[in-house]
């Protein structure tokens, strides 16, 4: 347990049930090469919602959570920092105040789609499906995407 002010600002953690985060669990279960990683998932409560943080392990080298404000990003960072399964923890703040702030763990994610899918531990079939559906669309697209929700 941290013994300095971060403890007071940290977002609450929970062990969400598959029912509580059913859409997230279903999404990850359909894509992860090792769905057993969901057993170590942690829920982070942000503005009344529970965000599912899936740890690194096996072929999954890293992950992230996306939040809407800098304050939420700092609270999530403070909550997950130092937890097992969340190595090399860091914040990535967007140039735009209210969008696309992420809390990342593991090595920096690759830029290339297939490599990024492997970085997040997705099954080859999930990566192939993503590449088929998004071929040519992602190059230079000016949208705020969530790499973990793409493949």
Language-model-derived ranges and their functions:
Residues 1-109, 115, 124-151:
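A conserved ligand/cofactor-binding region detector
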